[in-house]
């Protein structure tokens, strides 16, 4: 895995947030390590008065306690918004037979609406909390948790976010907890992805950054080729999530000025 100069990485993120978020930022705080890390960095960069955290549970669990812990340790303003009645009303009016994943996407997009409503009313921007591991594999909801104005940790792998979190003082219980998108009870990222972040990041780094072939990656890591191919498939299938919508080109059909 690549080795970063973490002190300089942290300083660069702080400079980035100061430049982009000078008027203030709004962050969705889930109780997980990614959002906690962004909240800590934003508070260090801008001061607590310029950071608003939104905690938006669909159901009450320990994540809400962890999210509150982050906000209260930082001394930032925060709001707890129960999105269950909003989501349930929306689903009821859709009159569709949604599966668990479909419901999860609506939860995520509801949170996005909340974030932007608050940001717009305050003249602030939304800071995203996606990391590189999620971004490359498409492990996010399009126009949901993947939506933000700026994303300070999007070029850091999950394992690198863990390292930064430890260095900047994110509570240990948050750093060590199993990552979860909080879309249903007992849901974890690694169960859904079918691979640990430690191994996923090793594969992604070799495949994307170093451009190493699949067979060599499998041999290098001592894992089945099928696992490397599964990661490659996740990247390919989620390509549309990493760009704005595109349409057909008509440049070759121009017949006049």
Curated annotation (Swiss-Prot):
This is NH(3)-dependent NAD(+) synthetase. It comes from Pyrococcus horikoshii (strain ATCC 700860 / DSM 12428 / JCM 9974 / NBRC 100139 / OT-3). The keyword Lipid biosynthesis does not apply. CDD domains: NAD_synthase. It is an enzyme of class 6 (ligase). Keywords: ATP-binding, Ligase, Magnesium, Metal-binding, NAD, Nucleotide-binding. GO terms for biological process: DNA topological change; NAD biosynthetic process. Homodimer. Belongs to the NAD synthetase family.
């Amino acid at each position: 895995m690549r080795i970063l100069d973490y002190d300089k990485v942290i300083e660069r993120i702080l400079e980035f947030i100061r430049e982009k978020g000078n008027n203030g930022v709004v962050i969705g705080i889930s109780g997980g390590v990614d959002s906690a890390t962004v909240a800590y960095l934003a508070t260090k960069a801008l001061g607590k008065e310029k950071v608003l955290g939104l905690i938006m549970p669909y159901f009450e669990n320990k994540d809400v306690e962890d999210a509150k812990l982050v906000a209260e340790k930082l001394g930032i303003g925060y709001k707890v918004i129960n999105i269950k009645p909003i989501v349930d009303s929306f689903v009821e009016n859709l009159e569709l037979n949604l599966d668990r994943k479909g419901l999860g996407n609506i939860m995520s997009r509801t949170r996005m609406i909340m974030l932007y409503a608050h940001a717009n009313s305050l003249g602030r921007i939304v800071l995203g909390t996606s990391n590189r591991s999620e971004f490359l594999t498409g492990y996010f909801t399009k126009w949901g948790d993947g939506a933000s104005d700026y994303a300070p940790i999007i070029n850091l792998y999950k394992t690198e976010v863990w390292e930064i979190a430890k260095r900047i003082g994110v509570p240990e219980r948050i750093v060590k907890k199993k990552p979860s998108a909080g879309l249903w009870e007992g849901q974890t990222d690694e169960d859904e992805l079918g691979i640990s972040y430690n191994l996923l990041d090793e594969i992604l780094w070799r495949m994307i950054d170093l451009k190493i072939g699949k067979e060599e990656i499998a041999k290098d890591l001592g894992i089945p080729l099928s696992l490397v191919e599964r990661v490659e498939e996740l990247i390919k299938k989620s390509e549309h999530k990493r760009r704005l919508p595109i349409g057909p080109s008509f440049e070759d059909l121009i017949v006049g000025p």
